[in-house]
Amino acid sequence: MKTGGIDGCKIGWLFISFDKGNERWEVLETKEQLEEKFLETDRVFLDMPIGLEDEEYTRECDALMRKEVGGSYSSSVFSPPIRPALAAPSYVEANMISYEYTEKKLSLQSWNITPKIQMVDDLLTTHKGLEEKVMESHPEHLFQILNEGEIFQKKNLKKGIKHRLKLIEEEEPVVDDFFRDIKEEYRRSEIAEDDIVDAMVLALFAKWSKEKPLKTIPAKVEKDAMGLPKAYHFV
């Protein structure tokens, strides 16, 4: 069973796998490369919204995840665009559509990743059954599980990055080499340090899901109008 974690970055997507004997990292710069990775991998944990609402501003899974991570970390969970706004050509139009349906405007943070959400949505709706392999997950939630539920320094601080690396290194010693190699090959403006540690923790939990039962938030998973699950996955 091939597993991996994928996080978005400025130049595309960062894929990491900790599969025994085939540990590796790859940068996926095109939709075609992402599609190929989705198709060839048996389980991907992805930090990107998948199932979308049609008229509700906030997905149930996002509201529950904010409570789960708690405190100032709740801001790491934001509401993605509703499906009618997904193909809007501009932020202004996406805002108008969002307000028409929900009476709330789309956050700029959500708009900035809308092209990536749209890319993932297109691939998952084009390839039926792919949604059973590609699963939405939340890195900060996974780090909290790794750290036995404790809150620690945020990722925008050096201490936060080092702490997260140490947590993963206890399970996968290769992470130091991966972190160094990626930083040597790519600038921070292309792949940020938090993108690297996020892809790593996603990869770790995807690997663990081979042996441990999958869990979801919420426990009962609802699907959107296109049949995509609105849930966060973890083990």
Name each model-derived stretch:
Residues M1-T3, G8-F18, N22-V235:
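RNase H-like (RuvC/DEDD) metal-dependent nuclease/polynucleotide-processing core
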